């Protein structure tokens, strides 16, 4: 029998036993053909590899991620991640959908890539409703019906609107879930349910959703798995405490390791492989970590042709020089080498072509000093204000109350150690501008501005001086989107994202370096978080606990109630553009 490749005496990861055994592995065309121990087998390989000192594992599968989080396009992303052993991803391109709708999704899906990209239907575009946030695109029933016909669509993307899912039978998200269940009854329905437990969890799961990838904690982690939830561990959930729950309860079949979001600068260092290593360091046996990054995600997504090394399965695999350090020597996709250690990153020969209109999409007005004068009608010298307080770990926020002086009819927010947070509708639909306050997010004078503001991607700017806020907003508008940091009336760092204000086609090293400079500039201003970019960009995400901001205002993300900036009993904010 003629075969293409024969790997001899390799230490093979045997999925069924979750152990390593020494075997010979034959590959024919793009699939595994024969796996055997004995030497008297009549095979004629075109290429023989002596791999007796290497470890062979299936290609890594990322079952929940967003390519847009890396701020790059599918072809560039593909080139970047195959070197980390990732051979299959399930992408939820809801950032692209929020900006460009179905047209943008199809542009993403048409990309030709080295790794296999399957797609989730963005279920929550917008993440709440058009009455709570303004987006460029909307994915409704008609769009979902069209996407259900696509062969690369294999699941419903994370359903995020807790209130609509649990308590509003006629909501759009419930209608989308019903449509998917009718037309594709075996298709996985992905969920987003942070800080939900007890009967509220049951209400959420009753809709048919069966997974969660949000920030996990030991108590609710066990409760969710016992309730039938498939858990997807992103980086911040990979803790010794959470891993102990998995190990103690033998929950390996009910969880996988994912990335969710990997920033462009972090992509220079790794991808799913880094989370696998982190899980091992947190106490997960390496054999179980491999299982949860290959087999369980494949099984979850119905990808029965991959996820293990066995006859007839797709020949996606890695050769490791060392198991403990997860040192990748070679990556194979469909039986072909796509990466060898020491090989530099090559920019793709062919990348996506987007219409010119995708690069002129930010339609905000330029802010002026007059726009930032917060006038208050009150008889009091101080007024109570609702203020957002961020955390230094994770993306959750809280609402606190602060007494803020009023002088000559103007709110003196700077004297209360606050920063002004502004969200501006950027699609030319309604011109909304909302104003909120944050409690001491910066220790130095400056401002941060971005259009990479989850999930609606309106223009968001936050700062503690009027001059820096104006500079940051005006320059970001001229740049047509991205990230920008200003201090002392100078631009300190920029990361241009000209495609819809969320993506760049620059080489990944250049893009990553630009974002790293933005991150360092944010740190220099004293913005503290374990992931500064994601922390800032989710201040606008109205499905992330507990208080976030859209172009309509400051919102309690669970009740979907808006809070006024000034307590009504104390005064009224007189600003014509304030919602």
UniProtKB/Swiss-Prot annotation:
It comes from Enterococcus faecalis (strain ATCC 700802 / V583). One of its GO terms (molecular function) is adenine deaminase activity. InterPro entries: Adenine_deam, Adenine_deam_C, Amidohydro-rel, Metal-dep_hydrolase_composite, Metal_Hydrolase. It holds the Pfam family Adenine_deam_C. It is an enzyme of class 3 (hydrolase). It comes from the Bacteria. Its cofactor is Mn(2+). The gene is ade. This is Adenine deaminase. Keywords: Hydrolase, Manganese. It catalyses: adenine + H2O + H(+) = hypoxanthine + NH4(+).
């Amino acid at each position: 029998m003629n075969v293409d490749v024969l790997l001899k005496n390799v230490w093979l990861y045997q999925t069924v036993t979750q152990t390593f055994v020494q075997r010979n592995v034959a590959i024919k065309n793009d699939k595994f053909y024969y796996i055997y121990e004995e030497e008297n087998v009549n095979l004629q390989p075109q290429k023989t590899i002596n791999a007796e000192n290497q470890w062979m594992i299936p290609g890594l599968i990322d079952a929940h991620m967003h390519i847009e989080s890396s701020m790059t396009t599918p072809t560039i992303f593909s080139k970047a991640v195959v070197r980390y052993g990732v051979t299959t991803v399930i992408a939820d391109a809801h950032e692209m959908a929020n900006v460009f709708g179905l047209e943008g999704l199809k542009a993403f899906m048409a990309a030709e890539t080295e790794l296999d990209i399957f797609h989730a239907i963005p279920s929550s575009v917008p993440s709440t409703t058009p009455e709570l946030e303004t987006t460029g695109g909307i994915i409704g029933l008609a769009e979902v019906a069209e996407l259900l016909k696509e062969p690369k669509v294999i699941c419903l993307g994370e359903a995020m609107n807790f209130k609509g899912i649990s308590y509003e039978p006629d909501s759009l998200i419930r209608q989308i879930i019903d449509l998917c269940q009718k037309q594709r009854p075996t298709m996985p329905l992905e969920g987003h349910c942070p800080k939900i437990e007890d009967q509220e969890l049951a209400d959420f799961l009753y809709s048919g959703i069966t997974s969660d990838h949000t920030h996990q904690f030991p108590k609710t982690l066990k409760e969710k798995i016992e309730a039938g939830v498939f858990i997807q561990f992103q980086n911040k959930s990979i803790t010794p405490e959470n891993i102990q729950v998995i190990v103690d309860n033998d929950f390996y079949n009910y969880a996988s390791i994912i990335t969710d979001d990997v920033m462009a600068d972090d992509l220079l260092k790794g991808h799913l492989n880094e989370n696998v290593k982190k899980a091992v360091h947190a106490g997960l046996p390496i054999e179980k970590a491999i299982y949860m990054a290959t087999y369980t995600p494949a099984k979850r997504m119905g990808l029965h042709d991959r996820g293990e090394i066995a006859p007839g399965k797709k020949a996606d695999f890695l050769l490791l020089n060392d198991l403990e350090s997860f040192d990748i020597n070679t990556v194979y996709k469909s039986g072909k080498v796509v990466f060898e250690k020491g090989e530099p990153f090559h920019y793709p020969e062919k990348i996506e072509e987007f219409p010119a209109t995708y690069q002129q999409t930010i339609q905000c007005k330029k802010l002026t000093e007059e726009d930032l004068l917060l006038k208050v009608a009150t008889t009091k010298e101080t007024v109570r204000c609702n203020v957002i307080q961020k955390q230094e770990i994770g993306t959750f926020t809280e609402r606190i109350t602060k007494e803020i002086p009023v002088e000559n009819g103007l709110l003196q927010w700077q004297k209360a150690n606050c920063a002004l947070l502004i969200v501006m509708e950027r699609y030319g639909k309604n011109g909304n501008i909302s104003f909120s306050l944050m409690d001491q997010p910066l220790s130095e004078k400056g401002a941060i501005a971005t259009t990479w503001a989850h999930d609606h991607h309106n223009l968001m700017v936050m700062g503690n001086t009027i001059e820096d806020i104006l500079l940051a907003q005006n320059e970001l508008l001229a740049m047509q989107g991205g990230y920008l940091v200003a201090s002392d009336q100078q631009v300190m760092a920029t990361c241009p994202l000209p495609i819809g204000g969320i993506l760049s086609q620059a080489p990944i090293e250049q893009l990553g370096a630009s974002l790293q400079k933005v991150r360092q500039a944010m740190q220099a201003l004293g913005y503290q978080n374990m992931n500064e970019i994601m922390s800032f960009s989710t201040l606008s995400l109205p499905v992330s606990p507990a208080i976030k901001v859209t172009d309509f205002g400051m919102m309690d993300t669970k009740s979907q109630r808006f809070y006024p900036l000034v307590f009504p009993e104390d005064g009224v904010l007189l600003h014509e553009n304030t919602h």
